[in-house]
Swiss-Prot record:
One of its GO terms (cellular component) is cytosolic small ribosomal subunit. HAMAP family: Ribosomal_uS3_B. SMART domains: KH (SM00322). NCBIfam families: rpsC_bact (TIGR01009). Residues 39-107 form the KH type-2 domain. Residues 230-241, 257-266 have a biased composition (Basic and acidic residues). Signal peptide: none annotated. It comes from Burkholderia mallei (strain ATCC 23344). Keywords: Ribonucleoprotein, Ribosomal protein, RNA-binding, rRNA-binding. It holds the Pfam family KH_2. This is Small ribosomal subunit protein uS3. Binds the lower part of the 30S subunit head. Binds mRNA in the 70S ribosome, positioning it for translation. Part of the 30S ribosomal subunit. Forms a tight complex with proteins S10 and S14. The gene is rpsC. Residues 214-266 are annotated as: Disordered.
Length: 266
């Protein structure tokens, strides 16, 4: 049975960038990757009410730069910046290097896949009907500029005994078009019946990725004369003669010269 490839991993280095941007040798790679996973889990739990979409981690020389994308940056910063300072201190303790924290605002949270998935899971935990939550999220996304959206929920929906999967789609969601900007996210709702998984795909239009448009080189026509001319070539030759094969060349015909004096041709 066919399976869906991860849309973000499928488009890395084509139209998407990595969420962890650093280089490490073989000895340190696993430890640094595990550190990034722990930092993201901590931020997700700590900033649960701040509507965090994604976290980008960069590691310039013996430092760390963490960019938090949130639709509610005021909740992350706190009163007079108190919360952000406490957050920075905890991150420095976890990572062991100086940490710089940047906050980026998400302008349209209704079209961000991670925020849509988190919103649906929160509604499922409050016992709201899953169909109502999914359709409301799709309507808001299409109203604010998304060209297509697909939402899938799986688990004991509405508390039924047998788990099932249901999905809804509106608009276009071209998963195998590399230039398509597909925002993908997952989330889990922890209900009294068990865990319900939610997946969201949002199609935001086509992009060439990092604004690197392909450069088309101009092909100039080669005007140098060809060495071996074809038999039917009508270009003039060096001796001034030319024409197609079989055509009469210039010059007088044989026997068509001037008659000698006193003689007439019969």
């Amino acid at each position: 049975m066919g399976q869906k490839i991860h849309p973000t991993g499928f488009r890395l280095a084509v139209s998407r960038n990595w969420a962890s941007r650093w280089y490490a040798n073989n000895n340190n790679f696993a430890a640094m990757l595990q550190e990034d996973i722990g930092v993201r889990e901590y931020l997700k739990k700590k900033l649960k009410n701040a509507s965090v979409g994604r976290v980008v981690i960069e590691r310039p020389a013996k430092n760390a730069r963490i960019t938090i994308f949130s639709s509610r940056p005021g909740v992350v910063i706190g009163k007079k910046g108190e919360d952000i300072e406490l957050l920075k201190t905890e991150l420095q303790r976890r990572m062991g290097v100086p940490v710089h924290v940047n906050i980026e605002e998400i302008r349209k949270p209704e079209t961000d896949a991670q925020l849509i998935a988190d919103s649906i899971t929160q509604q499922l935990e409050r016992r709201i009907m899953f169909r109502r939550a999914m359709k409301r999220a799709m309507q808001n996304a299409m109203r604010l500029g998304a060209q297509g959206i697909k939402i899938m929920s799986a688990g004991r929906l509405n508390g039924i005994e047998i788990a099932r999967t249901e999905w809804y789609r509106e608009g276009r969601v071209p998963l195998h078009t590399l230039r398509a900007d597909i925002d993908y996210a997952t989330s889990e709702a922890k209900t009294t019946y068990g865990i319900i998984g939610v997946k969201v795909w949002v199609y935001k239009g086509d992009t060439l990725g990092r604004n690197d448009a392909p450069v088309v080189e101009e092909v100039t026509e080669d005007k140098r004369p060809r060495r071996n001319a074809r038999p039917g070539d009508r270009r003039p030759r060096r001796d001034g003669e030319g024409g197609a094969p079989g055509a009469r060349r210039g010059g007088p015909r044989r026997g068509a010269g001037k008659p000698e004096d006193g003689k007439t041709g019969e």
